[in-house]
Amino acid sequence: MISFETKNVEMPLIDLSRVIRWLEEVAVTLDRHVGNINYLLCDDEEILRVNREFLQHDYFTDIITFDYSYRDKIAGDIFISLDTVRSNAEELEVGYDDELRRVIAHGVLHLCGIDDKGPGEREIMENAENEALKIF
């Protein structure tokens, strides 16, 4: 089950049922099944608090993924700062909705085992994001 909640922000005008079906399809293409995935859409202050408290990082970010997956069943809590998504969209000169979909997919891709921290991993993640967006 995939759920979306908000904290300190309004829910974006997105078709949640379509997004959920899309994320399930993305998982299946990577040989995974969806367990409990909770998205919390929040503001910069909340994501900074989470980043400090749980990861000991003192900076803003667009997404934090806590992975509780087991074998081929993906599960986790995914925090997304809508403030950072908006500023990234402006900086990258892409639409807000497009950037939000990219970040939403990014979280599921992390749960599917794709990382973006090591050498060459960022390119792998970007390719996976692009493939996921094609499915949408």
Roles of regions detected by a PLM:
Residues 1-101, 112-136:
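An acidic/histidine-cluster motif and surrounding catalytic segment
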